[in-house]
């Protein structure tokens, strides 16, 4: 994308396809580029620095294999006239079922829709200069790409679905106290740049030695440092917390007299994934019933395409969460996305929080992936606790 931004002949560009729809795994990438100089842009694309192979080269489409993070990824670049850009973008974003519904809406108005525009009965071509105008033409509000899947999105009220702008704070992040790369102060500054109203520092607990988990003395020292920094920064509320391990025997990594001194407690499973479902559920139940535990982080422990996680009984866990008013997390790290969209859609009564689990200031940008996961699950913003205003969250904490 940085390369495309440098090309003067490119007027607009956007990712499309499954990547734009925030699918958990995209096998290849699609980009739509608007230009009045397609042959010039084509030559620039053929000179892209990380090119591995030219798959197909034409005036309106260039298919390449590019190297990224030691992997080879197929990328299709479609070159279109600026007037058709948003129609091509909508068309190639998909999904197939979503576009079938679009064509049905067009047919009902005696029109035909394509990647070039909307053809009228008399053969004239309507071309709009935003996706929103295309949807508006068919009497619909713009639908976020993450929700463009099976077509049912056309039959839902999407007015209250969460958006990235609704997020007021990040409740799960790490610092140099454990396995994070930046200090508390640096994380505060990064959260302020995000425009957040509040944040929680949640370094790992003592048993997670591989992540330099905090012994009690260091945890309390950090707690004091956070409270002092909270006095210093007036533009954001900074809360002390922990991402506390739920140990294999079901006990928690800190005693209640320690937890009571923190503002916000997260519980998580990081070890003994091979336990039985019954054993896993006993651990999660013990955490959910603890009066100081606010939410369960990455509730299945999966890492996409690397490990399945520890497979709790999801139905029992959601019932337990509802009974105990324990919040479940959508971990926004794109390698986790845990809980996933199908689960949050299936259990609409569960309160949620969307967090980045940031170990680096750049990881705060992961929030968009978590929000997209929530959108796929048609999550209304009032289900997500970190959409609360600053004062409302303070009252919730207290």
Give residue spans per PLM region.
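Charged catalytic cores and adjacent phosphate/nucleic-acid-binding surfaces used
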Residues: 22-175, 184-195, 212-236, 248-398
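Short, solvent-exposed loop/turn elements at beta->coil junctions and helix N-caps
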Residues: 16-22
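Helical scaffold of the NTase/Pol beta-like nucleotidyltransferase catalytic core
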Residues: 1-14
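A short linear hydrophobic-aromatic micro-motif
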Residues: 11-16, 51-54
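Conserved structured catalytic cores and adjacent interaction surfaces
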Residues: 191, 205-208
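Ser/Thr-glycine-rich phosphate-binding loops at phosphate-binding pockets of nucleotides
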Residues: 175-176, 196-202, 206
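Short beta-strand segments at enzyme active-site cores
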Residues: 199-203, 238-241, 297-298
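Active-site catalytic microenvironments in core metabolic enzymes, especially phosphate/sugar-handling
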Residues: 241-244, 369
